[in-house]
Amino acid sequence: MKNDKVVFFKDDHSYWLGDQQIPSVGKFTGRFYDSFEDSFWKTHITLKRILGEEYMDHYRSFKKFQPDAIDLFEPILRDISPIEFHKVKKVVDDEWTKKRNKANFNGTKFHNLKEEKAYLDGFLINPFDGKKYPVTRHESEFDNETITLDFMSLPDGGYLEMLVVAPDFSVAGQSDEVYIETIDGVRYIDINDTKTNEKKPAKSSLSYYLPPLDYMYASTHNKYAIQINSYAHILSLYGFVPRNLGYTHYKKYDENSGVLQVLPVMKKEIEIIFDKNLHF
């Protein structure tokens, strides 16, 4: 594989420059919040199904959002048959997996239909300014690849599933929609991602980011904000100026239901994340 582009493989969600694997934005940002949240909630749901209000009374006795898992679960698990617990938890795990797989399938299908429509139309409507931006299909021999490594050479327009990579190849990611507009020599970027969560992404959470970002909820909304700001930061390293950032949430995969959530430019938080990752 040549070193003239970064490529993406969907099966393991990996990025490569030749034989060099490049960390993803998800890996960069995921180091700043606990990854056990799914496991926590699966256990919580399992105990609720087995013990009902007896467990919920215990859960509500904690005066903080998300108690430590050991403090919460250990006293209860001591009095439950391991066989019964694992039997019920397997059902919860299977339900969780089926729901996630269905959401991933439908979400991917929705993304693909939106992209194909934009290519057929020949333009994308920027949700921030309402203007039409020309789009061009860029063929790839992989699941995705960079259009060029000289990002500032890209013409103004809209870009779908744009693969971005830091100049030092320290991190890479993909953004659903990137809009480039040059005004008085300044190259502005707007970024919009498509989200199809069953519910509107929550802004609060039962957990927080890890220090030094522990003033922020580790909520779905904030994770999206950090992710999208990371794409903007990567492009800013080439000279682009982030102007408008956000994501559009669609209900039940209905294109007419989209609601744009505008995000702030989080320069301080992103610089902390990128600086810390360089020292891992």
Regions found by a protein language model. Give the residues of each.
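Metal-dependent nuclease catalytic regions and adjoining charged, substrate-binding loops involved
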Residues: 218-225, 230-280
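Catalytic cores of nuclease domains that cleave nucleic-acid phosphodiester backbones
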Residues: 90-211
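Charged, glycine-rich intrinsically disordered N-terminal tails and low-complexity linkers that flank
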Residues: 1-109
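Accessory terminal regions of nucleic-acid processing enzymes
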Residues: 1-2, 119, 168, 199, ...
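Generic surface-pattern signal
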Residues: 52, 78, 97, 115, ...
